[in-house]
Amino acid sequence: MIMFCVQCEQTIRTPAENGCSYAQGMCGKTAETSDLQDLLIAALQGLSAWAVKAREYGIINHDVDSFAPRAFFSTLTNVNFDSPRIVGYAREAIALREALKAQCLAVDANARVDNPMADLQLVSDDLGELQRQAAEFTPNKDKAAIGENILGLRLLCLYGLKGAAAYMEHAHVLGQYDNDIYAQYHKIMAWLGTWPADMNALLECSMEIGQMNFKVMSILDAGETGKYGHPTPTQVNVKATAGKCILISGHDLKDLYNLLEQTEGTGVNVYTHGEMLPAHGYPELRKFKHLVGNYGSGWQNQQVEFARFPGPIVMTSNCIIDPTVGAYDDRIWTRSIVGWPGVRHLDGEDFSAVIAQAQQMAGFPYSEIPHLITVGFGRQTLLGAADTLIDLVSREKLRHIFLLGGCDGARGERHYFTDFATSVPDDCLILTLACGKYRFNKLEFGDIEGLPRLVDAGQCNDAYSAIILAVTLAEKLGCGVNDLPLSLVLSWFEQKAIVILLTLLSLGVKNIVTGPTAPGFLTPDLLAVLNEKFGLRSITTVEEDMKQLLNA
């Protein structure tokens, strides 16, 4: 059987077809796993439909609320490639749905849910049979009837909500829960399960998802800073230190904290990778002296870089790609919702097996000459610099701020972001976040009267900090955010980037430039609508874009 998936930037796009629709997607996901993820999403939509009904009776099931976004997160790009675990999530979704349904019926014997996913049952234990069942839920199954524009808007909402679900799970791990957010999530998820076909309603839904995600990012920020302190500027070594070692990748700061606690005094050093880099800025994480540095570059280079790393690797969230290519599948471990067939999975927070493996390996034989980069410009630090920024602008020392961030990826066109960063004039500042920073974060940019010209605000979810800074600057200057000498140049790859974009648009931020390509699910008509409403456009050339943005 074949798949249909168009959720990430590397999806197949030719004049003849749009989306991965073969035995395997460009990310390495098999048709089986992709189809079973469609089945899981349908089961989760049915679960959300009953969660909405339950709230009408005052029933709030926290097991349902915590499980639903977490399981949805498993379908995000480069997270879980393990078909049996995907089916396990679907079975758990149905079991939770039936329990919730029973709670509703106990209150009202006539309780019913009008949703096509509300009574979904898996037809078999056989993966092949389940894959055939999943064909009923392929996202483009009614494309001929509804057209490409409606399909594209459905997918914009589905993928945006998927990105928000990932942030909800990150926040939940840190003890953050907001009933209003979960109620809104279930309402949207259930509605998408009805296969809506009204263009205006779908556009409104996409903005609702963006607004909801702003609240999600707020509680995630509260969770991270509440547990680990507010990030402050910190130098991080990106070269090797002699000794045994573990590499930890992803976004989960709690996993990193637990690993640091458990490795303390063992002689094993810990390195961050990818989106874990901003962890070095948090006081409660950097206090561990054996958190010695950051290793590697963008996630797309992991098959080469992980093969060279002389210790075990822990993946806490996206992004994982085929570890058999570099033959390190025997020393990569997955956590939480991450999965790869044949790779060892850590069900809990006990890293002793990983530590034991690290102690058996050689580690780095010598320390390299340090190369230090600076991270840790969190929300509090950024707000503390607001008056300095305004003063520099008023004295014409600072002409413009570029928010240059987002996802990294493998396309050669992404060199645009390196070229853009190095072309930014000396009287302008670069604010960056997410893994797109690896395109330029080891370059030297100097400063403006002591203020670094490259300011690393953190992970992708730390777009929240950048938004708060922009709002604060606008308030202090008595203008709107769109009137600031501020331009957003964003790179996208997967669904977290999609929901960040929806968040910005829902807040009224205009004239965002994105690349390296437009999402495959957005038709020319939809791109025209977004351009007309928000001024959203794709990158062109560095020279043209720089000229236009500086003169805006």
Curated annotation (Swiss-Prot):
Q: Does the keyword Isomerase apply?
A: no
Q: What Pfam family is a match for this entry?
A: Prismane
- Bound cofactor: record note: Binds 1 [2Fe-2S] cluster.
The residues listed in the UniProt record as binding hybrid [4Fe-2O-2S] cluster, with positions renumbered to this chain, are 251, 275, 319, 407, 435, 460, 494, 496
The catalytic activity of this protein is classed by the Enzyme Commission as 1.7.99.1
One GO CC term of this entry?
cytoplasm
Q: Which residues carry this modification: Cysteine persulfide?
A: 407
Task: From the Swiss-Prot or TrEMBL record, state where the protein is found.
Answer: Cytoplasm
Q: Which cofactor does it need?
A: [2Fe-2S] cluster; hybrid [4Fe-2O-2S] cluster
Reaction(s) catalysed (UniProt annotation): A + NH4(+) + H2O = hydroxylamine + AH2 + H(+)
Report the enzyme's class at the first EC level: oxidoreductase
Query: What are the UniProt keywords, alphabetically?
Result: 2Fe-2S, Cytoplasm, Iron, Iron-sulfur, Metal-binding, Oxidoreductase
GO molecular function: any one?
Answer: hydroxylamine reductase activity
One GO process term, biological-process aspect: response to hydrogen peroxide
Positions bound to [2Fe-2S] cluster:
5, 8, 20, 27
Cross-referenced PANTHER family: HYDROXYLAMINE REDUCTASE
Q: Which family does it belong to?
A: Belongs to the HCP family.
Role according to the record:
Catalyzes the reduction of hydroxylamine to form NH(3) and H(2)O.
Record-given protein name: Hydroxylamine reductase
User: What organism is the protein native to?
Assistant: Shigella flexneri
Q: What gene does this protein come from?
A: hcp
